[in-house]
């Protein structure tokens, strides 16, 4: 069975989409190829790396990437994680489904916000897996 492709997108591919890629690979990896990208590339936020490390997921080797049109066009599902990405998502081919899962941006906020958003993303991906 070929794996489906899920592509997580946020503004800077720095926090939310990086954490979603980490959780996605752990939770969905048997059935899905998991990628992330951004409208811009801001670099991976060190606090996002630390937040995921706290739950045993290493995203320290991830890079912050702009949206890759090839991955985008070959995805089965594109998930936008913030309103900016939702509003500025490139046009998708008709065969690519899109969903919006909005999460607060933890960048520049207290550590507890990174933990909260990390856990909310995990819950959303676990919920997605069971539907």
Curated annotation (Swiss-Prot):
One of its GO terms (molecular function) is arsenate reductase (thioredoxin) activity. Disulfide bonds join 10-82, 82-89. Keywords: Arsenical resistance, Cytoplasm, Disulfide bond, Oxidoreductase, Redox-active center. The keyword RNA-binding does not apply. Gene3D superfamilies: 3.40.50.2300. Its main location: cytoplasm. The keyword Aminoacyl-tRNA synthetase does not apply. Its EC number is 1.20.4.4. It holds the Pfam family LMWPc. GO terms for cellular component: cytoplasm. It catalyses: arsenate + [thioredoxin]-dithiol + H(+) = arsenite + [thioredoxin]-disulfide + H2O. GO terms for biological process: response to arsenic-containing substance. InterPro entries: Arsenate_reductase_ArsC (IPR014064), Ptyr_pPase (IPR023485), Ptyr_pPase_sf (IPR036196). It is found in: Cytoplasm. Catalyzes the reduction of arsenate [As(V)] to arsenite [As(III)]. Belongs to the low molecular weight phosphotyrosine protein phosphatase family. Thioredoxin-coupled ArsC subfamily. HAMAP family: Arsenate_reduct. This is Arsenate reductase 2. It comes from Staphylococcus haemolyticus (strain JCSC1435). The lineage of its organism: Bacteria, Bacillati, Bacillota, Bacilli, Bacillales.
